[in-house]
Amino acid sequence: EQEILSKNPDQMVVVCCGKGNNGGDGFAIARHLANRNYRVTVVHAGEAKTEDAFKNQQIWEQFGESVSFPSSDASRIINSADILVDSIFGTGLERGIGGAYHEWIEIINDCKAASKWAVDIPSGVYSDDSRIRGQAVRCDFTVSMQFGKTGCFQFPGSSLSGIIFVSDISIPFHADCLKNPDNENHLGTWLSTPSFIKKLLPRRPLESHKGDFGHLFTVCGSSGMAGAAMLASM
């Protein structure tokens, strides 16, 4: 919500909500945006299936406009959006996208919204390994909760995630739900960024010579495959 507010003042927002907790987040986002005088409409998949999502859906329907998908109204509303928020599926997706959901995502991808935002991860991208489950939303921005999701940083999922923001929702690092079963002291996944790599490289005096830091001997492939050896030796 804060990321959308900072970039898109005074525009029409359409929030597409599924039946699970990701959809519940979408209803909450719609409510907060409406409270800040955005014009917001929710397109939803029907009655929410989880307790938290159902509560947020009930709150929204007391004062906000919503339509269910599939319907001609839903398609029209999606195509009228300036900003579209994808909150259909999140990290819990375990099946392929088919039927009405496949059609829904196609309409979202074809609409001419100025910007499309994913909540946590684009719908249809598998969070652990970035596979596409039949169909997936192409987003300009993704706002991941607390930690970036692996599926947003690997292909093909990364090509659909756009610019990625990570939003702190105050989950402590040592929480049980975040522990790696093989090593509870860390999460088990590291994202290579320029700042991360820079920390691994020792600071070298300006007057130093390459010979001051040892020698490297590389054993590589056949004589016709020298490219990798050259790159590794640079």
Description of each model-found segment:
Residues E1-A45, C152-M234:
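Small-residue (G/A/S/T)-rich helix-start motifs and N-terminal tracts that mark the onset
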